[in-house]
Amino acid sequence: MKLVLQRVKEASVSIDGKIAGAINQGLLLLVGVGPDDNAEDLAYAVRKIVNMRIFSDADGKMNQSIQDIKGSILSVSQFTLYADTKKGNRPAFTGAAKPDLASQLYDSFNEQLAEFVKVERGVFGADMQVSLINDGPVTIILDTKCH
């Protein structure tokens, strides 16, 4: 899995002008699923995300997790994280998982996250508009195959 984590003051995702999910303080996750991803990748990503200390404590140090601040997650599927830009000027997305597998793993990922924090989400495969107010900004890239 490839994920982009953005610390936000607020974020929302809309489809056809209607809000599908919205959060206040927390994390916006852009989630890409690869063809070789499995339950271990999901567990690793969930463990990292819910325990990562990227929120400020009373002294202004990044020392608190999303659980500590009782924050929320907005999860948005994004196969374009698997873009291959080596040839030409049009990205290829053949490195992303097929939609059936990706949808299944994305759903499972969100269900596992929801065991720890409130999770709002977009709609898998939909054309979505994402709005956010970055906090920091703090943006972290997580690749479950690089640990």
UniProtKB/Swiss-Prot annotation:
One of its GO terms (molecular function) is Gly-tRNA(Ala) deacylase activity. A motif (Gly-cisPro motif, important for rejection of L-amino acids) lies at residues 136-137. Its EC number is 3.1.1.96. It is found in: Cytoplasm. It holds the Pfam family Tyr_Deacylase. It catalyses: glycyl-tRNA(Ala) + H2O = tRNA(Ala) + glycine + H(+); a D-aminoacyl-tRNA + H2O = a tRNA + a D-alpha-amino acid + H(+). GO terms for biological process: D-amino acid catabolic process. Belongs to the DTD family. Homodimer. A Gly-cisPro motif from one monomer fits into the active site of the other monomer to allow specific chiral rejection of L-amino acids. This is D-aminoacyl-tRNA deacylase. It comes from Streptococcus pyogenes serotype M12 (strain MGAS9429).
